[in-house]
């Protein structure tokens, strides 16, 4: 988290994963409850029902160790349903940057992997550059190699069925 705890009171939704904030971080949880008092939706993702779960609108009891699959499913849903703030994505992230032709992701490994050194040649992931040396951008997000579309393709494997099979 990069904001001050007090700023949580301004949230529309709060997602708590793997923390019993009500018991272990009561001062921080005070600000979460202020957000709820103002209408925010509180979600708690944790295998164990706790005092935090009891105060939230939703408790999602995952199988232990599957939170990354759950988050991947959330990312996929947000991307597929276009539930993101497009102006923010275009102007404040690298989503529109076009990745070079050497980039690939196959069999669980990114391009540039050297099994002998067990390390990556990160130059394989470089952005395409324009004549001025700056990364090329596709603000339409239609280029199949822009970061946004590569991310959509990567997270598409986190379907509702796959995620629910893994997380329980």
Where are these regions (language model features)?
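A short helix->loop->beta-strand "cap" motif at the edges of active sites that frequently abuts
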Residues: 35-42
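Glycine-rich oxoanion-binding loops at beta->alpha junctions
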Residues: 1-14
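Glycine/threonine-rich flexible loop motifs
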Residues: 21-30
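The substrate-binding groove and active-site-proximal loops of carbohydrate-active enzymes
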Residues: 16-22, 160-161
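Hydrophobic/aromatic ligand-binding patch that stacks against planar heteroaromatic rings
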Residues: 7, 34, 51-52
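Long, well-ordered, tryptophan-enriched scaffold segments
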Residues: 48-167
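The conserved SAM/SAH-binding core of class I Rossmann-like methyltransferase domains
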Residues: 45
């Amino acid at each position: 988290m990069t904001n001050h705890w007090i700023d949580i009171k301004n949230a529309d939704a709060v997602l708590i994963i793997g923390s019993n904030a009500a018991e272990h971080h009561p001062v921080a949880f005070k600000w979460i409850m202020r957000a709820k008092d103002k209408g925010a939706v509180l979600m708690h993702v944790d295998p164990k029902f706790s005092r935090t779960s009891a105060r939230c609108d939703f408790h999602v009891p995952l199988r232990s160790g599957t939170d990354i699959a759950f988050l991947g499913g959330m990312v996929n849903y947000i991307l597929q349903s276009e539930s993101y703030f497009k102006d923010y994505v275009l102007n404040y992230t690298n989503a529109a940057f076009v990745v070079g032709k050497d980039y690939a992701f196959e069999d669980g490994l990114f391009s540039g992997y050297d099994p002998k050194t067990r390390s990556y040649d990160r130059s394989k992931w470089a952005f395409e550059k324009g004549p001025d040396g700056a990364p090329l951008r596709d603000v339409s997000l239609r280029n199949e190699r822009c970061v946004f579309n590569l991310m959509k393709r990567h997270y598409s494997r986190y379907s509702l069925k796959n995620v629910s099979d893994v997380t329980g």
